[in-house]
Amino acid sequence: MDLKKAVAFLCEKLQVVETDIFKIEQIHSGFTNFSFFCELKDHSKFQIRLSRKDVILDRRNEQIILQLVEPFFSNPFVYFDVTTGNAIKRWIEGTQPKRATDLFLCRLVESLKKVHSVDWKPFANELLIFDPLVYFEKTKLSAFYKRLYLNLTKKHIDIPKTLCHHDATFDNLVWTPKKQVILIDFEWSCVDNPYYEIANIIREELTIETANKLIDIYGGLKRKLVFETVIYVLLFAFQWTEIMPQTEAILNYRKWVEKRLEYFLKALFPSIWKQAQKNS
């Protein structure tokens, strides 16, 4: 992404001129957005988000969710284009954690439970309700994994639904100097259930040992179902990579998803792994 586009966007929306900018740099090239850090000469700091045009997201859904979670995390956005997803938000000081300490996991759970406590039902007609079969008809998963996936989705039918961040990986949060977890980037957020939320963090970030700590800290979850949901989420992630633009980054991510699937199946569900190999 051309840095000049970020500069022009910032100047237009904040009504500043280029000479007001002290520093600007690209900090992230994600699957859906390009992100830039900018500091003005008056020391105010911002993050600029420019959306990829080849990935369509429901930005109205994101906008509503930002309003719903504002009492917990405030709303850092100073400009938000609900049509394009392009945005500018105040910079939140902090880092992404290098490892999941017990304190970090506790603070992460506290933040997740705030999201899960939100009364979303008044907005039920506007919010995205997670559909695990949204990509299923197009997937190239093997017949064995298709059957497994369908069986796993059925286990979630009767689980009470909550608002979920749905992508609370370490890239999508800030670990502040005050040792608090601020959740950011709600663009994939939707109504689902805490099992998916916790499983998605596990499949992206954690070893089985640390995953067990997270499950214990959250409390009230059936351990086996959480790890079954990890498999379910990994199979969903594989399907997601199939419908995204087939860039090198997406293809590499798919390989990583396959490695994580192998890791969890071999360690926790060896009989399923053996069946998968026989049917591959």
Curated annotation (Swiss-Prot):
> Which protein, by its recorded name, is this?
Uncharacterized protein MG356
Specify the superkingdom: Bacteria
- InterPro entries the record matches: Aminoglycoside_PTrfase, Kinase-like_dom_sf
Tell me where the transmembrane regions lie.
none
Q: Which GO terms describe its cellular component?
A: cytoplasm
| Entry's Gene Ontology BP terms | phosphatidylethanolamine biosynthetic process
GO terms (molecular function) for this protein are: ethanolamine kinase activity
